[in-house]
Amino acid sequence: MRSQRIVHIVSCHAEGEVGDVIVGGVAAPPGATLWEQSRWIARDQDLRNFVLNEPRGGVFRHANLLVPAKDPRAQMGWIIMEPADTPPMSGSNSLCVATVLLDSGILPMREPLTRLLLEAPGGLIEARAECRDGKAERVEIRNVPSFADRLDAWIEVEGLGSLQVDTAYGGDSFVIADARRLGFALRADEAAELVATGLKITHAANEQLGFRHPTNPDWDHLSFCQLAAPPERRDGVLGANNAVVIRPGKIDRSPCGTGCSARMAVLQAKGQLRVGERFVGRSIIGSEFHCHIESLTELGGRPAILPCLSGRAWITGIHQYLLDPDDPWPQGYRLSDTWPGGHC
């Protein structure tokens, strides 16, 4: 068997969302900070294409590159690669990374509780893993500072007319719209229509509202549309279903950790969620993230929250991605039957 490249991957999913972890075969990219390293990955595209494009990947897949942390307090760093973006942070991917680090023995597991400090491109996060019999059974993430940006703003959306939305940041940037007002029950059989609607809303919100992170001027767009049900209480606990539409055209199978963080920032800003109060985010496949606001803070002089979310992740496979020197598609390919806007 011959190959001019071997990339070692542990496959994982967190509450339904795939987050593969690259554990070997790739050198850390250039950059003085983890953010600079992630920008190099985003510009270069070589690794992104190799692991995310067909025949090795697909639009449903995310990949996470383990790298040495730049912050001396952190035990590991990682760079997130989503189908269209290389974002500051991801909740489901952080759960996959923490689980792979512990379940595979890359970092030592201490039962019943292991604490990790990890560095994402968007900042430090703390992971607290409940562990038993060699398995990280549930991981809680203390996320980066999150904030509401625009509340109850109006936009004009093609085919939908005037629509009231919120925008917020939870480690990534979101426009949040009321799914019920758009006629959605947030069922799995609505997935294709949810994607089409969400992409229209994201496009309109970027054009008409825009977004700029207060301390990271590089992050100047809205990434996702969160189509969310109104919050309601079950057994006294506030929660809501959602479908987060990810470019170029898929739905997050998990409840979306950065999306739940952004939603909690909006709910707190509107006086609907208190510090310490539980919030349950539910996905289109019925999986859950259990969340709360740990404390209030500020970011770049604006009010913010420190959100926490917890969920489960499971390793699904171990792979070695190879590249035969005669393979005519070393960067892979994307076709629009499954990858919107894709081309060979």
Swiss-Prot record:
The keyword Transmembrane does not apply. It catalyses: trans-3-hydroxy-L-proline = 1-pyrroline-2-carboxylate + H2O; trans-3-hydroxy-L-proline = cis-3-hydroxy-D-proline. Pfam families: Pro_racemase. Disulfide bonds: none annotated. The active site is at 90 (proton acceptor). One of its GO terms (molecular function) is trans-L-3-hydroxyproline dehydratase activity. NCBIfam families: T3LHypDht (NF047722). Belongs to the proline racemase family. This is Bifunctional trans-3-hydroxy-L-proline dehydratase/2-epimerase. It comes from Pseudomonas aeruginosa (strain ATCC 15692 / DSM 22644 / CIP 104116 / JCM 14847 / LMG 12228 / 1C / PRS 101 / PAO1).
